[in-house]
Structures are given as structure tokens and as C-alpha cells.
């Protein structure tokens, strides 16, 4: 009788262990992607994320719901709230306003950001150490700001007045222009910030910047990236060169940039997501990742129109 009881107990123990093992891994994961606006950089990041996630988990084992806020940061909140209501397994927030909305929506569902420049600024974390903690981590698209500032003096050595053009609704854009301004002013250049609220007043603000500046700096800024034609339509006819924070902006209105690969950035985020979903990594201790490589690039067409000779070490934008 004791042997029978022992066998039954052992069998129950094995069944219990099997149940625990099966609950650790799901048959299919559901991931919600909130992307702020459709443009080259963010699209590439989303594509890289999806590719990495499908490769790591198997395409049949993951459902990815992609929602785009069409450039309206207020639309991010209902998108991520719907993901929370649907009890998705993970949220990927593509751009700072998407990350801020996701962070406000849930403290339980894992959140990975990408195309976010500075997490401490975006989330209001003082003395940011590189790890957000809680349910948030991700990747940053920050290219070295001191090197971007140096590009301004390298490409426009005679410039005295620098205009810093950015969207006031994007906290990370303000962080970038403040940092670049401090660096340039230490070199003796005069800097003026030109903030536009949204795409509706961009043309007027860009015109004011072009009228008073020898060169304009546009940081990594989602609103600017979605409206480069407006900036180019003002600055190129005025003969004012634009140094851009990322390649998407540069291809539309800039002469040069220090660029990262947004596809690779999104891909790295997707690999992080797979580890979080399978329990291989703890998101609360996962440090924010950064691009491994930055590439100096130039816009051949705009350089030619402005009579500028590309500098050595810069690659043409394809």
C-alpha cells in the first residue's frame, strides 16, 4: 500500500512540474506596437523589431499588433490602453511619446521603447543610471551630440549664428538642442532656439530660423522627420544648410548627419523582447541599449544645390 501511495505521489509531482513548465512558456505571444508617426526611421525600427521577434520565437508563435498614431502624441494613450485591455504580453513603444503613454498605462506589462533618445528625460528620472527598472527598458537612438555639434563647425566653419529648430512637444528634442547649444556656445558661436508646436506652425518658425541663421541644426525629432519637405522648402531656397540628427531628416532637408541604423536598433529591441517574453531576461534589470555604430553621411543633392563639397569620411545617402 505504501508503494502504491508513493507511486501516486510521484506521478502527481511529475504532473505538477509539467504544468509549471508549460505555464512558463506560451504557445503564442501577443505583442502590441505603438508607433508615433509613419516615417523612414520609425518604420525601419518597427520592421527590425518584428523581424527579430519572429526569428527568435518563430513567426507562428507570435502575433504582433501594430498601431500608428499618425503623428498625434495624444493618440498614443488610447492605443496603449487598448493593448492593456487586451492583456498583451509586451508593448513596444516606438518614439518618446509612445513610451510615455505606455508607462502611464501600465506598471505590469513589460514595455520596451525604441527610437527614444534619452530615457531619463522621457520618463522624468533624475540621475538616470542607464537602467529604468520596473517594467520598462529598450533602446536609444542617441548619436553622440558633441560629434553632431562638431559637424556644424566642420561643414560651416564661417558660421556665427546657429538656429536650433525643434518641436516643443518632444522632450528629447529639447534635451538635444540644449546639449548642442551649450557645446557650441562654449566654442563661441551664437545659438538661438526655434521651437514649433506642431507641423502647422513649422513653416513660419523655420522661416524665422532661416532668416536669422547661418546654419540650422535639427535634432532627432519625429515631427520634423515627418515634415522635412516643409523645412527644405524654406531652407534650401534661402541658402541655409541644415545639419540633421538622423538620416531620415537629412535625406529630406539636410546636408549631413551622424546616423545610426534604425533597422538594427529595432532588431536589437526585438531580441530583447524575445528574452523578456521567454523569461530569459528580467526587464527590471535590463539596461537601455545603444546603437553599436554611427556613420557620417551627406545628402549629395542638397550639397550640390548649396555649392558645398562633401567632407572626407562621409558616405552619400543612398
What are these regions (language model features)?
Residues 248-301:
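Flexible loop/turn connectors
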Amino acid at each position: 500500500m505504501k508503494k502504491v501511495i508513493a507511486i501516486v505521489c510521484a506521478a502527481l509531482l511529475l504532473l505538477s512540474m509539467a504544468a509549471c513548465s508549460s505555464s512558463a512558456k506560451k504557445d503564442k505571444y501577443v505583442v502590441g506596437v505603438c508607433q508615433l508617426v509613419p516615417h523612414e526611421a520609425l518604420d525601419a525600427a518597427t520592421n527590425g523589431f518584428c523581424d527579430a521577434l519572429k526569428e527568435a520565437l518563430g513567426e507562428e508563435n507570435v502575433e504582433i499588433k501594430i498601431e500608428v498614431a499618425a503623428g498625434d502624441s495624444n493618440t498614443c494613450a488610447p492605443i496603449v490602453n487598448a493593448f492593456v485591455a487586451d492583456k498583451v504580453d509586451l508593448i513596444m513603444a516606438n518614439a518618446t511619446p509612445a513610451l510615455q503613454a505606455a508607462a502611464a498605462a501600465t506598471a505590469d506589462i513589460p514595455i520596451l521603447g525604441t527610437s527614444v533618445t534619452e530615457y531619463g528625460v522621457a520618463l522624468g528620472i533624475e540621475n538616470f543610471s542607464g537602467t529604468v527598472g520596473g517594467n520598462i527598458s529598450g533602446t536609444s537612438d542617441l548619436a553622440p551630440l558633441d560629434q553632431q555639434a562638431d559637424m556644424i563647425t566642420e561643414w560651416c566653419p564661417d558660421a556665427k549664428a546657429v538656429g536650433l529648430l525643434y518641436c516643443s512637444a518632444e522632450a528629447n528634442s529639447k534635451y538635444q538642442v540644449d546639449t548642442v547649444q551649450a557645446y557650441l556656445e562654449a566654442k563661441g558661436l551664437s545659438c538661438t532656439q526655434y521651437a514649433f508646436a506642431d507641423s502647422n506652425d513649422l513653416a513660419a518658425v523655420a522661416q524665422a530660423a532661416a532668416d536669422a541663421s547661418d546654419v540650422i541644426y535639427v535634432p532627432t525629432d519625429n515631427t520634423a522627420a515627418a515634415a522635412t519637405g516643409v523645412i527644405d522648402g524654406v531652407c534650401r531656397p534661402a541658402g541655409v544648410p541644415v545639419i540633421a540628427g538622423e538620416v531620415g531628416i537629412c535625406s529630406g532637408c539636410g546636408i549631413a548627419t551622424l546616423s545610426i541604423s534604425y533597422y538594427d536598433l529595432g532588431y536589437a529591441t526585438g531580441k530583447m523582447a524575445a528574452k523578456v517574453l521567454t523569461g530569459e531576461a528580467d526587464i527590471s534589470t535590463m539596461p537601455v541599449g545603444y546603437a553599436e555604430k554611427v556613420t557620417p553621411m551627406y545628402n549629395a543633392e542638397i550639397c550640390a544645390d548649396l555649392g558645398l563639397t562633401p567632407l572626407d569620411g562621409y558616405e552619400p545617402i543612398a
